[in-house]
Amino acid sequence: MHKRAFLGAASALPLLAAAAPASTAASASGPALLTITGQIARTNRGPIDPALDQMMHKQKISFDKGFTFDYGALSALPAITIRPTLEYDGKVHALRGPLLVDVLAAAGARMQASAAVTLRAVDGFAVDLPLEAAKRQRFIVATHLDGKPMALGGLGPLWAVIDADRIADLANKPVNERFGQCPWALYHIDVR
């Protein structure tokens, strides 16, 4: 896909999500920002629609059911603040959002020790992560950076991120090597 076409499609995501009732959380009033699929017990949307779920379809994502969160639903979950040094400017920033495991639990995700997740960003970047690592490293789904909501086109609107400065095996690495498992512009999580 050409970069310009991708960026145009990405900027239209909120409009597509708002137009597709299956893409919004049951109690949500805004567009879906995050879709959880796979081994989940709760659902509020049906299967992928190849015509309307263009980004997922082009990234070869397939599912029969899912659970979506809009901004309000994510904001309603208990949130924590972390303060990692970011690779982009070498400065400490405050990132706030719910723990990834709390987001998964809200969707009724399978939480056994053997479970794993794939975290996928809008550009197709995907990270496979054992659920135990997500718990141990206290991944959050950040919605705010330095007290402000994160925008699409920056690191947001959602970023699966850790406080790498406080994880011993990562804190010893150069800053630009600490966030390889932290996709920004997160929009899909598959649980298996």
Identify the function of each model-found stretch.
Residues 5-23:
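N-terminal export signals
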Residues 21-192:
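N-terminal intrinsically disordered, low-complexity segments enriched in P/E/S/T
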